[in-house]
Amino acid sequence: GRAIDFLQNPASKKGRIIACIGDSLTHGNIGDCWVERLRDEFPADTILNEGINGDVVWQVQQRVDSILSCKPDIVVLMIGSNDAMASFNANSGKRYMRNNKLSEIPTFERYKKLLPELLDSLSGASKVALCTIPPVGENPDSAVNQHVKMFNEFIELTAINKNISLIPVSRLLWNDLSLRAYPFRKDYDPKALPIIRRIYGGMMHHYIFKKSWNDV
């Protein structure tokens, strides 16, 4: 459930309250959901899935009060992938601003201002863990992954400055990808149509042809 569900039924509380905050990578409605895995691993705790598809850091800021109303013991924050994609080029930025109804295009400079502010607002939780964001495609030298790397370097620095735990999602995924026994054939295309084709193509292979997400 989400914070809004918990606040409507506080009697559902069990164990620690763990709030997992982020975007579609946390929501997990397409692909494997790491929040569901946490629920399986820690059944005695209340785990809130506060991932919303497409969210940038500013949007998380706007909804953080309802999450804090649940008095979470632990917060896991992974936010920045959409900020990185929106700031990758002008067309992506305009698309995010239009689709998310934002007052301005997300930029790296704005992210550097808003992420520390968001972490300050979460400081009431007993434990806060900040995640780096995953790669886009499998080519570490691609322009988009160099752009993502810039965000991750700032995330790592922020975790040090705020003295909070860092979960190195990016490094762990790159380590895993380095073990692959197949060559990558495609890489990220910032245009909307190729992205949609790849997303829905992956969904078809998984849900219709029953391939595992790893095989997809």
Residue ranges and their predicted role:
Residues 12-14, 37-43, 59-216:
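Alpha-helical cap/lid subdomain in secreted, periplasmic
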Residues 24-27, 51-55, 135-138, 142-143:
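Short histidine/acidic/glycine/proline-rich micro-motifs that form metal-
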